[in-house]
Amino acid sequence: MREKTLYARLAWTGMRKNRRLYLPCLLSCAGMVLMFYILMGLSGSPVLEHMSGGGSSAIILRLGTVVIAVFALIFLFYTHSFLIRRREREFGLYNVLGMGKGNIARILLWETVITYGLTTGTGLLLGMVLYKLAELGMVRLLQVPVTYTLTVSVSSLLAAAALFAAIHTLILLNGLRQLHGVSAVGLLRSESVGEKPPKAQWVLTAAGAVLLAGAYWLAVSIREPLAALTWFSAAVLMVIAATYLLFISGSVTLCRGLQRNKKYYYRPQHFVSVSSMAYRMKRNGAGLASVCILATMVLVMISSTTCLYVGQEDAVNARYPRDLSVKVYGDRYLLDSEKLTQVRQGVESTIFNFGGNVSNVAEYRTISISGLVDGGNIRTDSSGASVSDSTRAVQIHILPLEDYNAATGQTLPLSDGQVYVAALRAEFDSDTLSIDGGMIRHVMKREIPMLGGPSAADITPSLMVVVPDFEQFVPALQDYFMEKYRSYPTVVWHYAFDTDLPENQQGNIDGTTPNLEDALNGYLAGVSSDWGVGVSVESKAANRADFYGMYGGLFFLGIMLSIVFIFAAVAILYYKQLSEGYEDQSRFDIMQKVGMTKQDIRRSINSQLLTVFYLPLVLAGVHLCFAFPFIHKLLILFNLDNRGLLIGTTAVSFAVFAVLYAIVYKLTGNTYYRIVAEDTEKE
């Protein structure tokens, strides 16, 4: 019986004696189990499922569970490799005392079982306790009524248990693989093997600098939001690769360059710090690069999602400038003034009969096509277009001059063959406008305001073209498309207005209250049946919930992922300080023996730690500054164009993160000095 429990007791004793190493790992793993359970549970929450905007939030949260699952796999592999490296000497001693690798493997198995049981059990227990708090916070973000029913998601419990069981199994197999390839002598001498001097790697350093410069150039040079979306992933990958190259190779290359400067290097205040820094960066460059990337991810997520959440009402108003919008999709009926008057009177009668008053009416017709801008020509045939051509894609909304003047209250003049052009998220500077080389019109050089609403929802850049002869232009355009593509665009009649009705009577929000949106849909259903046209009604009040659901979900996910990434960064920094503390114990002793005082040594080490520790924060701040134009353009795709708000949220996010970072430095720095003091105080 004692033999059966021997390996479990050895595993538990080893973990308990190395609790300084294991405790952060256990806490981090339990935290990831907790976050995964909460996000998984919320994504299938019946509370979110039955509320307006909950569907958008659920999709976003499901994506978050995938991110946490992938990140947990990578991060736990990293922490476990550190633990194994620190305990190789202990395992080597077991081997010398008579244990075979099979026996050590059984110890590792028990350690994995204990780790899995502690972390998964603790994480799921805390998850069940904190789940309702997270659900209440999510509901508050969506600005919907709160329910206080306590629930436990069994499916989320099973999914979390299965996921982390698989991760710990993979970690165990990797540990056994490492153990199999090392001899007993190698295990015993693993911590005393001499370290080769780091070499300058100019090629890798130059590659990192070029990649970083290229990513920064993309960030500041791209002007169109859709192009920013296209190139964002590429820029992110370039920044990640460049950060690792510069931290691992660039920092060592810099130190080697300083060592070649004899006037600078051979001074007491520089000699020790520069030579030691080269070794530090060689050992810890990858870890510091990971911290820098995690810090950048946190800053980008928090600043952008906070900006979205705070400015969500601005986004709603940009997409829906008026309370309700009616659309009728037809052809000859909308070019016939009598038919147009008939449907207008029907809409107005429906509004009056419901008891509402209208104001701020905007009524206009449009016909829309898409194409690629080529100077002043719009190429409608996209066959053979490449990915780079997506930056030239535009959506073109054509409307009559009289409708535009009526909707904006202006009296703009136009002659035959002339047009006005307004651009949204696009640039158009040509003196002429043509469609596939035909229908050439002269562009009048005058800035005109863009009509909001449908064009604000376009992901692609938009051009609004005002023509004086809409009734003649539309048939010619439709005939051309019919001949070339066997299909043609249709005319859309827009009727948007504000009303004095309460919001729950404007749109179908709760599904039970009689509302104007349903009344208009009822009338337009008859129009659609009689005329064979398409109809739609959009309510700002009803669609506001979807906006809040999406932006609230992104904000909540940003907070949750930021917490996970911050804990991961703290764990990496903690393990870095531990490893450096153990490695510097003997160096302190040697420095004292060659004549340096403890005060000089502490000053030198403190200088190195400050440089190494704050370098990721400084570079993350630089990354954030260059990412700002990218973030701003991506937010425009979410109908939010508020540069001042984004600057504010970005500045506050960086300031708060910097304070937290400084606190972590203080705490982990104390751990480093305690480890070093354990050796020096014995002298």
Label the predicted regions.
Residues A315-F567:
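Basic-flanked hydrophobic alpha-helices used for secretion and membrane insertion
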Residues L23-C29, L34-I38, A162-I167, E195-L308, ...:
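Alpha-helical transmembrane segments, especially those used as permease/efflux helices
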